[in-house]
Amino acid sequence: MEGVLYKWTNYLSGWQPRWFLLCGGILSYYDSPEDAWKGCKGSIQMAVCEIQVHSVDNTRMDLIIPGEQYFYLKARSVAERQRWLVALGSAKACLTDSRTQKEKEFAENTENLKTKMSELRLYCDLLVQQVDKTKEVTTTGVSSSEEGIDVGTLLKSTCNTFLKTLEECMQIANAAFTSELLYRTPPGSPQLAMLKSNKMKHPIVPIHNSLERQMELNSCENGSLNMEINDDEEILVRNKSSLCLKPAETDCSISSEENTDDNITVQGEMMKENGEESLGNHDSDLAQPELHSTSSSPESHWEEDQEVIPTFFSTMNTSFSDIELLEDSGIPTEAFLASCYAVVPVLDKLGPTVFAPVKMDLVGNIKKVNQKYITNKEEFTTLQKIVLHEVEADVAQVRNSATEALLWLKRGLKFLKGFLTEVKNGEKDIQTALNNAYGKTLRQHHGWVVRGVFALALRAAPSYEDFVAALTIKEGDHQKAAFSVGMQRDLSLYLPAMEKQLAILDTLYEVHGLESDEVV
């Protein structure tokens, strides 16, 4: 289905007409049908979103991925909204049925595998008994050849049954537990889906269980020990290493090679030492860090005395502190935008409802810059190249340009940085921290209407305890003393890196006279 719907953009532009296209379970929107060749301005996966009908406005409907993505839409009439609701609901139902069927097949295969494994254990025990019986017959020197033949026949039959059952187990396992079924995300998922990992409630360490299982399955199937680690697992392994390395003065060597494929294949062997699992390999693109203590000071042994607790900032998919600047302090576009997406959930933790307008503006500006980037990824490798390209084309200060979007994006990031700095420096009143950060950054660019919106949002700010609790990975961690240490540790790495990149952008905008005093 396709047609025009009104979409809420921001408090400045309000409701704007957009051309929407529902295809393959994905709802995409464009400025107009004629501009479709430029690529969609945004999309949402129907299988994972909620469809909500507005309680008052009978032409409005909201599409929401909780904590991640929001589409506020209005049709031109009640009948038109009804047609869209039927189409969207049908698309969601079809995708849900498909996922339910896959989950059902997965559960059935799991039960079948458990049954076969029980049979396998029975045949294994029987096989051991018959081997012992054969040894006994051989050692006692029984002359009855008939008894020896019977024992040999039974042993052969049991071996054949054991091998057949083992083969059936492997067939079920290969069908039910492939990496594609376990780790694959739905095709066409919005980029914001990467933020899901920030809401993980399980500890980082148990990842080795799934890695070990995958290695065992692949070794039986291919005859060699192969392990596939998808992007999310690679990030978790990296974060787990960084948790041990960041607080102390240690040397860490991690050799990695960028791979354009979705997965990274590592060949190696699994070794267990002192109850802890470690991954070792010889021909690998991912080398494990080696820890060398460089100091006998209390700081260098802090991990021996305190529990290392991961926080929201240490488990980000991509962090500003992970970004490596390119030549001439070039800020890599893709990594920067991914880091911006990763910090957006902080606004949800402050209040998913009252801070929704702030979040929508921030995400909207990220998407505008990304839209420019995907038009020519080879050329626009850095943010500076995007800005300079628009400066040369004399469109840098045109409304909705990538340069204008980046201007407001960096202002929004300065607000978040200012707020987090206040928290890091010991401010226990979240409302005060937000107000101080807003006064130093965004307030001068806002008119009285937008200032009023922010004032309302500030009044609804959570308590310090609730905000800190929302930054935990495991429920209850915020009550531990080590969590405060972890927050200080992570923010001490995160905020300086963020400040450095924003300073580079400030210099770029000042040199080319792109700063604007316009008030919105």
Swiss-Prot record:
Gene3D superfamilies: Glycolipid transfer protein (1.10.3520.10), Pleckstrin-homology domain (PH domain)/Phosphotyrosine-binding domain (PTB) (2.30.29.30). The modification Phosphothreonine is found at residues 139, 153. Keywords: Cytoplasm, Golgi apparatus, Lipid transport, Lipid-binding, Membrane, Phosphoprotein, Protein transport, Transport. Transmembrane segments: none annotated. GO terms for cellular component: cytosol; membrane; nucleoplasm; trans-Golgi network. The lineage of its organism: Eukaryota, Metazoa, Chordata, Craniata, Vertebrata. This is Pleckstrin homology domain-containing family A member 8. One of its GO terms (molecular function) is glycolipid binding. The keyword Kinase does not apply. Residues 275-285 have a biased composition (Basic and acidic residues). One of its GO terms (biological process) is protein transport. It comes from Bos taurus. The PH domain of FAPPS binds the small GTPase ARF1 and phosphatidylinositol-4-phosphate (PtdIns4P) with high selectivity, and is required for recruitment of FAPPs to the trans-Golgi network (TGN). SUPFAM superfamilies: Glycolipid transfer protein, GLTP, PH domain-like.
